[in-house]
Every structure is written in C-alpha cells, then in structure tokens.
Amino acid sequence: MGCERDPGRADVPSPLDASWDRVDASTKDTASDLVDATVDATVADLPSTDMGHPLPDGALVDVRLGDLSPFVADCSVPLGDPRREPQETLCDGIDNDCDGQVDLLLPSGPNACSVEARGVCSTGWAGCAEGARRCFAPGPSPEVSDGLDNDCDGVVDNARAAALRPRVLVLAPRYLWTKGGDEIRALASILDQWGIPYDLPTPDTEFSAALRGLLGRYSLAIVPGYLEGDAVDTIARLYLEEFATAGGVVLLHKPLTSPSSAEVLRLAGLRRTTRRTDVTSLRIGGVAVPAVRSLDTAEERDLLVTDDPSARPVETFVLEPDPEASTVIAARAFAGSTEVGAVLTRRGLGHGAVYTLGHDLHSWSHYRCYVNCFEPAGDVLGLLIRDALREGAAGHLVVKHTVPGLEDALLLSTHDIDATESARSGPWGAAGATQMASVLHGRGAIGSFFFTTDYVSGWWDPATVRSVCALGMCPVGGHSVRHFTSPASQPVGDCSERFPGYVPTTLAESTLCGEARVSLMLAGEAAGSAAVAWRSPFLDVHPRLFDVLSEQGVRVDSSFAVGDFKTNLPLDLAATFHRQDLFHHRGLTELPVTLDDGFGARDEHGTLRTELQASNASSFLSAWSSVMLRNAANNAHTTLLLHPSFGVGHGPENLQVKLAVVDRLLQLAAAAGLRTDVSVTALDAFWRARRGALVDATYDSTRGYQGTITAGPTSVAGLTLEFGDALRSFDCPDCGPTRLAGRRVVLLGALPPGRRVEFTALPR
C-alpha cells in the first residue's frame, strides 16, 4: 500500500533530482565509492550478501543480492558514445552514467572543484544548478584551532584571543507576545532543534534593561520583528551597536519603514524596506558572509517562497542598503526571474556585524518536492543562526549535537505493515515485517514498525509483532485498524471503542478514535509494551487526529512528509508556528518522512504511483543515498518509510528487492558514519530529554572552555556536545564516562533529572 498523502500534486517533481554534497574523502571507502559500485555494476557482479538470521520460530530470511535481477536503469547513452561517463560530470540534461538520474554529480573524483579563494573557501564539489555546472565551496567562518584556515585569510589557526560566552539572547518586541507568542515559540523551537543555548526574557522585560551588560553575556542577539521605533529606540540602538563593535552579532528580523523606524534602519545600515507579496524565491549568494557558510548546496541557496503569488501571496520585506553604512547583500529576492532587491544584508561594525532578514524563514517556504528528495528549506534558518553564533563567538561555540553519540546523523528505518504479505506468513515465507526485521538485525540496525491491526479482514497476526520484538524492534506503533483514509467527514467517535466490538467494514462505519485506540491497544498488547508512536494511513491527517493521539498517550507521530515542513529534524508540535489548527499545541514530536519506497505524479491519465522494484532500484538507491548524505552534512536526520510488501502490481520477488535495497542502504549509512540503531520512540525520548537539558559555557583564550550541564525534568542519556574547536581534552568529574572525538564529546551515562555538572575543555 502506498503511504503518500499527496502523490498527485502537479508541482511535485521527480524525486530523483538531487546532487551530492560533502563526503569525507579521507575515509577508506567513501559512501560515494560504495554507491558507485552499486550503480555501475550489475547485481551479478556484487558479492552475495546473506542477510538471513534465525528467528524464534525457525524461519530464515535469506536474501542474496546475486539472486535478484540486475539493478540497472534503462540507459539512452550507449557504450562508445562520447557522452557516456563512468561518473557523471556534465550538466547537460542527460543521464551520462546510467544510474537513473539526470545531472547528479557525486562529490568525489572528477567533481572536485576550486574557486578563487584561500583556505577552506578554495575547494568544494561541483553540482548542477539551472543547467550549468557550478562549484559549491564553503564560505569563511571564524578561525578556530583545527589546523585549517577557517576564515580564508591565508593564515592557519590565527584565532582572535577572546573571553566570551557563546549564547543567544532572543529579545522579542512586546507586540509579538500580545499576538499570542506563536512566532516567538517557533523561533525558540528552532533554537531547541539545533541545540543552541539561548535566553528568552519574559514579555514584560524592557529592551534597554535586557541590553545592559550585553557584552560578555551573549555572542548573538536576535530581535524578531516586525521592528519599529517602539522596539528599537535610540538607547537600544546604541547598546546593540556597542555590542557589535566589540565583536558580537545582531540579527534583526523584518524592520518596517515608518516615521518611528529611523533608529532600526540606522542600526541595520538600510535606507528603507519595502513590503512585497510578489516574491517567488530567495537566492543566497553574492558576498560570502559568515552567517551563510553552511548553506552550500543549490537547494539551500535557492528557496521557493510560493509557486503562485497571485493565489498564495507571501509577505517579504525587500531591503535597500545604505551605501554609506558598508552594508553588503547576502541574499536577494526574485519575482519570477526578476530580481527585486535584497532580502538578507550584513552591516559590518568594528569586530562584529548586524544582519537583517526580510523574510519569515520559519513559517513560509513552499516546497519544490514532497518526498524522496533533499528539502532543507526549513532547516536554513537554524543553520544560519548557528553560523551567526559561530561568528559572534569567534568560532568558539558549544551546542547540543542532534545525535545521541559521535555520529553525524541518524538514518531512521520505519516500516508500515498494511498488507497481508507484510502482516502474516504465507507462500512467500515469513511475514514481510519479520523478514525486514531480520535484515535490520543482521546489520545491527533497529527499525520502527507501524502495524495495521486488520482483524476485520482476517490478516492481523500478533505473532508477527512478537517475531519483530524478538529481533529487538519494539516497541511498535499503530497504523489504524482498516487502513482507511481519514477525510474530515470521518466521525471522531468518543474513544470508548474496543476490540472486538469495533468492527468497521466501511469508512462510514469507522471512527477516528476507533482506528487509533484499537490499533494502538492491539499492537501494544502483542508487543508487551505500550504503543506510543503513530503513522496515519496514506499520510492522511484528520483535523482532530492530534487531539485523539494525545488522549491515547501517543508521544511521537510520523504522518507528514518533508515537503510539509521542509525540515529534517524532529519537530515539537506544541511550538510549531503553522498548522495549529491541527496540532492545538499538543505536545507530540513529529518526524517528517524523508524517503518513501514509492513516489507519485499526475498526467492526463490521472494519479500514478511508481513503486521501488528491480528495474528502478539503482535510481532509488542513488537518490536515497544522496539525500541521506546531504542531510548528514547538516547533522540532520533521514526518515525512511518502506513497506515490506509486494507493492502495487508486483509479486513476491519485489519484497526481496526491497529487502536487498534496504540492506545496501544500511551498508552505505554505516560507511558514511551514520547511526542506524535508534528507533522513533528512542529518538523521541532522547529529543525531549535533550530539549530540557541546559548547557552554558564560556571561552577564554588561556583557559579554554568552562561550563555547566543541567539535566531537565527527565534523565538524559547520550547527550553529546559539539564544540567550535577540535578538543585535546574534556574533563567533567561528575558526568560519568565520556568519549571524545574531534569536536564532539558524548556522555555515555545518564544524568539524573535536575543534576548539574561542571566541565572544562581545552582546544588542540
């Protein structure tokens, strides 16, 4: 069964349109090398891979890549054609290396490139943008002690001596609080997502009072808008200018042009701002400023605001720099193909800077793709803030890493059990769920299984849940009883529905409460542990779903795709700015689906769904690997949704194809240094505990880092700190065992609730 809620959108392009980015070529076998081997060779050329493991009932899953038909896409460029390449390097609209993808340049070998710059800014990887080959190289960042020329001035490790506190002050105008505070909570949730230490003063705090003594207490001050004179008066401007001159960074958001806004514009280094609703895209480029250093792919630099400004207008403030203020443009707004002005500027002040952003990145960004693609638009603001903090802290920041460990990111393997062959054994062998669990277990991975408990049709089998649990894949989640869609007209019910009395044979006889409550109850009973995770059939969300899930004790949901939120990190739905008509500030964690084993399109014949199968497996694998690695470069996660079933219109052999592709993806993830052994419920528990843990640190050029970690209301295990510098030592007597690698330190034990510990760390 397909689980895309919106496969028929005309604006959803092919998911196989992504480029690679940032692979560590120093590793013995890079992930791109492994993908090359998979794409360029037939399966018969690959070694047989036994993914079988004995199960409690004696069944054995034995899937061998060599037994499958070759994973080779149709190729229109024959051998001997001068356009044929072993690895694609051209941006010519042709699949030159026959991997099923057009103009996908892998970040290895011939795609290394250079630009006219020094230090780390001089080299990067080529990619295709607007039909042309471009070199995507990082911009400068503050110098730190790591053996590299980070600020690209031609000198290695010439870090500025400093005594500072890498922390953010969010100073929200009072009117944002009086509006309800949704924008403020959304900004705070982004800081929480990226583990950035911050303070958010109360609504009655006066600007001038909060800004006194700013120096030494913060490295970045964010003033969200709209901004007028009542937010930034003369005294506030002088404090902020003094802060920036001494090395701090200020980020202003959406200043207005009005009779009272002269001080705001003067601080920003702008002449005026103009409100527009015809902007369709934002393009980062021009001057390489430190705050956009991490935005180094085409998808991160070219953000779609709306596909139709006449039907869906979005407010953007175009900024006009003051030429006398040395203000530079870091991003521009476009109406169609016409540039209409600046949308991100930087005014240099002394040792620091004032940035101004004219667009609301945390709530308005139209998606270019729905699933099976690299969609980082919702992560751009977090990356920008993290780099702005890095600039204000002269590179010496401390943040909470997004992973419970030293790895760069997570691959979350999730599986919807919504077909007979995935739910129970038969002529095809063990249930598809059991076979998938065996593959995962064989690679040391942990999957999350969402069970449809269809006892009405007679294929619900609790023994399958028990076999999955025996392989370490529990707790499991709910996926409904009958796998119906959930239109708004579906009755909610009163949540008194019980098994076996709840017997819906049609959608009209079903209730939202019954589908959720009974599915969660049966799945939990079969697993022997409460089911606290949920995914809606077809990713179709009922308007009252989150009220019902919250009342049933669900803590984590995965019913949206990356195209819905444009983020690749868990979301706190209580603080999410938009769609509170659905969420009602319910405290669930949302994990958007990044990858799916099918994708949709619409043509004159209607809505179609293309399933993963032998003929397109190499294309899926290339696209999935590309997305996974590019997310990992941002420390963002990738959530895979794969159905361990035959698929639409295919027989038992297609299940074996899916198992083999997942096995190969797990190998690629391991080669790239990703964790694959974290379930959605484990990630939710870590994410909540991480959010409650407080980290505070200072940096001194003679003593290094000194700081504290305070656990929140729940115990936090696996908390990992990421520093701006590579470390030679980390000392925390009360932390328990720790492990240090490069810039990261993981606390191997668990800090009890409310426990406060002190640490010191010395750069190399």
Give each language-model segment a name.
Residues 169-171, 176-266, 441, 449:
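Helical hinge/lid and interdomain linker segments adjacent to catalytic or ligand-binding clefts
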Residues 258-272, 279-280, 408-411, 419-424, ...:
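Metal-dependent polysaccharide deacetylase catalytic core of the NodB/CE4 family, i.e.
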Residues 200-202, 384-406, 442-444, 561-562, ...:
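C-terminal domain-boundary segment and adjacent tail
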Residues 281-305, 311-316, 320-321, 337, ...:
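Active-site-adjacent pocket scaffolds in enzyme catalytic domains
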Residues 1-81:
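Ser/Thr-rich, Pro/Gly/Ala-heavy low-complexity intrinsically disordered linkers and tails
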Residues 71-162:
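Membrane-associated feature with strongest affinity for ZDHHC
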Residues 228-304, 324, 334:
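A glycine-rich, often tryptophan-bearing local segment used as a flexible ligand/cofactor-contacting loop or short
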Residues 167-168, 182, 186-193, 217, ...:
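A glycine-centered loop/beta-turn motif at secondary-structure junctions
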